Amino acid sequence: MLYAVTAIVQYLLEGNLENMLGRRHMKAEIAKLKGHTILCGYGKVGKEVARVFANEQTPFVVIESDEKAYNKATDDGFLCLNTNASNDEALKEAGIMNAKSLVAALGSDADNLYVTLSAKSLKPDIFVVARVDNEESEAKLKRAGADRTMSP
């Protein structure tokens, strides 16, 4: 009994309950979105895209697997999921079935290709913009279903 009480107090002191409740609230807010954009990646390019979306009041949710970048996105006030964007479940949790578009702004062309394939397999009519660093990858991203590409 004492161990259980100690564990609960420690959990509360470490802020885990606040994090858990915050994440639950964030997931509930994401579930309400309709016609939004999913932004995959909150690196240099993703931050700039998020800034533009925020300025234009475009509803969006960020998917970021890096804990530090995830924390930065939430600190910046954005709805964000801390998971891998190439995972179909992550895209579903971000509301892909209700989303109008997706921006694949991950650091590698291969990751952006995989996210594009995943997004188009889940929702073929979603509009996808994919970051591309290598000219050779641009054609592959278009074949995978990217409607537009962007080069940083």
How should each PLM-predicted stretch be described?
Residues M1-P152:
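Cytosolic regulatory regions of ion transport systems
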